[in-house]
Every structure is written in C-alpha cells, then in structure tokens.
Swiss-Prot record:
Subcellular compartments: Mitochondrion matrix
Cofactor annotation comment: Binds 1 Mn(2+) ion per subunit.
Catalytic reactions on record: 2 superoxide + 2 H(+) = H2O2 + O2
Name assigned to this protein: Superoxide dismutase [Mn], mitochondrial
EC number: 1.15.1.1
C-alpha cells in the first residue's frame, strides 16, 4: 500500500511565498486523495489481473495514471521545495543549465513560460534526457507523470493546478510562479541530477 509521505518542513515554513493554508490542504487533502484512490485502483487492478479480465484492466488505466501520477508528482514536489531554498544551483547542475539553456535567467524564463502556458491543470518540469545527456523543459497535463509519459527523468516539478496557489494568488498564476523560485530546493534538484547521471 502506498502512503502519504511526511513533509520535510512545517505547513507554514514556505511563507510568505506559499501560505500554510494552501500547504495543509494541498498535502493533507489533495495528495492524500491521490494516495487513497491509487490504493483502491491497484486493488481493483489486482482483482482484474487475477480474473484475467483485460477489459476491466484497460478501464482502470486512466485512474491508475491520474492517481499514480498525482502521488509520484507530489512526492517529488514537496522535496523540490524548502524554506531555505531560492537563489541559484551550484556546481555541475548550474553548468548543465548554462550549457543547455544559455544562462540560469534564460532557464528560469523558459520553465516559467512553460508552466504559465499549461492549459487548465498540469505541471511544468525540468527533466533529464538520458539518451541525449541533456536537460529539457516539458509541460504535462493533469497529473501525467513526466517519466511515464515522456521518458524524461524528473528533476524539478512546478505544480500549476489551481489548488497549488488559488487561496493566495487567486487566478494570477504568473505571481505564484514568480514567488515559487524563492523556495526551490536546489540541493534536492542537484541530488536528482547527479543520481540520474550515474
């Protein structure tokens, strides 16, 4: 059974950039719902497998993708944020960003633009293309998980579902995106980058 991971900081730790009310609802209600629904879906899937019921297996796949993706995405998202975040990455990750995007500022602009441009709900991502050995920006709709749908390894995810910002930023997604850069945990993103380069 999947379980809701603990946050590595308090709900109010990312204020003023993301307020405690948003963090509490986002983690304890939204992420928890993905986890619960994923467990229920996997149980039904096991039953369908045991019966050899392929039609039922296919019917369950959208729920598996949505709730499984929601669990994967949020588990990455919480660790990508930190009350001691912000600034720029250092070392190899910064070098790779400069190599693949020209500069850190250009990278920030591109990831912000991709995230602002998500229609409806979804995610903006910095991913690693293992085949090319390059960093890549991508946007995914809904809860589509980056690696499962594009093959890119997720390094940094920005949640642009309205539940991630509406209580504080209303419908002004660009203001939320401007603020989130102040709490990006570059140590975590760097760890992910170093791990996928091995």
């Amino acid at each position: 059974k999947h379980s809701l991971p603990d946050l590595p900081y308090d709900y109010g730790a990312l204020e003023p950039h993301i307020n405690a009310q948003i963090m509490q609802l986002h983690h304890s209600k939204h992420h928890a719902a993905y986890v619960n629904n994923l467990n229920v879906t996997e149980e039904k899937y096991q039953e369908a497998l045991a019966k050899g019921d392929v039609t039922a297996q296919i019917a369950l796949q959208p729920a598996l993708k949505f709730n499984g993706g929601g669990h994967i995405n949020h588990s990455i998202f919480w660790t990508n944020l930190s009350p001691n975040g912000g600034g720029e990455p250092k070392g190899e990750l910064l070098e790779a960003i400069k190599r693949d995007f020209g500069s850190f500022e250009k990278f920030k602009e591109k990831l912000t633009a991709a995230s602002v441009g998500v229609q409806g709900s979804g995610w903006g991502w910095l991913g690693f293309n293992k085949e090319r050995g390059q960093l890549q920006i991508a946007a995914c709709p809904n809860q589509d998980p980056l690696q499962g749908t594009t093959g890119l390894i997720p390094l940094l995810g920005i949640d642009v579902w309205e539940h991630a910002y509406y209580l504080q930023y209303k419908n002004v997604r660009p203001d939320y995106l401007k603020a989130i850069w102040n709490v990006i945990n570059w140590e975590n993103v760097t760890e992910r980058y170093m791990a996928c380069k091995k």
